[in-house]
Amino acid sequence: MQANVIIAATYANAKAESIVLSKELVYAALQLIGPQYPELGTTTFCRPSETKSGQHRRWSAFLREINMDDHVKFINIPAEEEAKGLTATMERYHNLWFEPSVRPAWQLVVVNGRHLLFVYDHYITDGRGGTYILESILDALNSPKQELVNSSILEFTTEIKGFPEEDPIKRAPAPLSLFQAILNYLRFWAILLLYRQKHLFFHDVVIKDLKLDYKNPQKEANLVRTRLHSLRLDASTMKKCVLACRSHQTTFTSLLHTLIKVTLAADFYPQAKFNHSTTVVDIRSYLKPNDREKTMETAASIVSSWDWLPQFRKAGEQTASEDNATFDANLVWELARKHRAHVLNDMNHRKTCFTAWHSVDLLGQDEEDYITGFIPGLKLCQRNAFSLSNLGAFRPNQSVGQDGRNADWTITSLEFSAGAYKTGYAANLVFNVAGVQDGPTTVHVCYEEGALGDDFVDSVLERIKMRMDAII
């Protein structure tokens, strides 16, 4: 369904640009943080189900140590490619599929001695958890305790307060609602019955219809290949965006979500009447307290938006030309404010993002239950949707040596991307956003190779940027 998650960070040394992330420095930093993150020593494996004959259940195991040589890679890319950003490199590693029964499913890729790509399977952690690990590496690089060692062995311990973590689903502030689950199921069927395909986004994607079967001997040949495109926003543009969003009582996430929907409705799907989209939300601050300081278990849910498209198309027509300096941007900002209010209302009052999360408990525990229970539901509700996730701005000034001294190392750029989903079974375009405070922000968008045209995705990003520049 989806290969992996990548968090990429650019590290810079304030003392001298010539100091790079050498093998000795990276290994020493990992040996400092290893005891904090036993997730990096986690493997999974399948065994016959304990309750259903002929089915399989996945189990986790924790290794006491691993060899970093198996997980840390040092590569060099041409200067011309590096100058364009890490998109091509990230795309290559999005097409890396791990075998978690052999070793823990993660790699740390050091690019040109300046960039770290943390590539990992979803069971290790979510996007926010990935930033915790790269931030901890930054702390380790700035730690006075750091010592260069010759060993490539990384040791773990499970003797950590609050580990293993209680399932975050059990810590959610709202109970399972069977009624809500049934209502959502009926809602999506009603959409499919009431609307023709041309009235929905992504009705023209190319879908390879596959039979989902745990024992499918061809499954290796059918693994998703990710295509990745990027929109890079410099510090000046982001500053203008943030100030404009504040003055209009909304957020950058809601503005971007609105611009995506406006662009698709006005420029690419002029006959579309209705759209369902999802905004990924980090719910850590809403969970019941846990002994562990930072939740590493997946703690991301979604807030669904159900929108009639004529108002978005109207907003798109108003902002369709850079040369038209007299357009009325009020409708764009109104839609962005409504989206922000909708997300906040859901998380603080309606809490459907929590009850939907709980619905996972309705599934069985076997691999086959996932195939027969979860995936068909995902296909029903997501196949005409896009998804947006924003990790926000990383604040490197918070990651300094614990002794209060000036930090030698800092992070100057942060990027986030999750691999494409299988077309027809989940969101067709997946937007992932991250940046650094007072620095650049990168919007990555991915999709399955062959499902959409490269020109289509490039054009979507170009028009989003055109409208963004016009309204800020």
Walk through the language-model features, giving the residues of each.
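Non-catalytic N-terminal regions of enzymes
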Residues: 1-170, 253-254, 258-266, 399-472
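Hydrophobic "lid/gating" helix adjacent to the active-site nucleophile
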Residues: 30-48, 238-293, 348-351, 435
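Extended charged low-complexity segments that act as oligomerization/scaffolding linkers
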Residues: 157-158, 277-321
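Non-catalytic, low-complexity flexible loops and terminal extensions
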Residues: 14, 77-81, 124-128, 136-243, ...
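Flexible, Gly/Pro-enriched loop and linker segments at secondary-structure and domain junctions
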Residues: 2, 42-44, 98-109, 176-232, ...
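Helical lid/core segments from catalytic subdomains that handle acyl or acyl-like groups
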Residues: 239, 302-401
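Generic detection of short hydrophobic beta-strand segments and adjacent strand-loop junctions
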Residues: 7-13, 229-233, 306-311
